[in-house]
Amino acid sequence: MRCPFCGHDETQVKDSRPSEDGAAIRRRRLCPQCEGRFTTFERVQLREITILKRSGRRTPFDRDKLARSISIALRKRPVEPERIERMISTIVRQLESMGETELPSSTIGELVMKQLKQLDDVAYVRYASVYRDFRETQDFARFLGEEGLSEAAES
């Protein structure tokens, strides 16, 4: 594997172990050229999924992009990284089990919202505000009312 620091083509695996949920192999690597250390994850990929964007563009599914968007919603929230990783793995498995090679981005958005609602209300509202394109405070109030979260917002 290529070193992300210096670009050297060969790196050494120093440690390998299964991830906590058993869905990946975590590897610690060392570059003999620059002595940089980094971690990689190896996962089974059942099929290539293409995402159909609202604009009509097609892009390959990117697990890391999914993880980043979820991490933004969960920023500064008291949720353990292991729970976040399990949630991401659950969403990816659900997408792969749909048996489709092409999925609309709205499918991912709805799965993320469903999982976040179970995990953390604040992250759920944060994600919804971007996903549903809230523009005014009334959009938040309407959403909170629809979701039965308005009482929590008032207390």
Curated annotation (Swiss-Prot):
Keywords: ATP-binding, DNA-binding, Metal-binding, Nucleotide-binding, Repressor, Transcription, Transcription regulation, Zinc, Zinc-finger. GO terms for molecular function: ATP binding; DNA binding; zinc ion binding. Its cofactor is Zn(2+). GO terms for biological process: negative regulation of DNA-templated transcription. Residues 49-139 form the ATP-cone domain. The keyword Repressor applies. It comes from the Bacteria. The keyword Nucleus does not apply. Binds 1 zinc ion. A zinc finger (unnamed) spans 3-34. Residues 7-22 have a biased composition (Basic and acidic residues). Residues 1-22 are annotated as: Disordered. It holds the Pfam family ATP-cone. Negatively regulates transcription of bacterial ribonucleotide reductase nrd genes and operons by binding to NrdR-boxes. Belongs to the NrdR family. HAMAP family: NrdR. This is Transcriptional repressor NrdR. It comes from Phenylobacterium zucineum (strain HLK1).
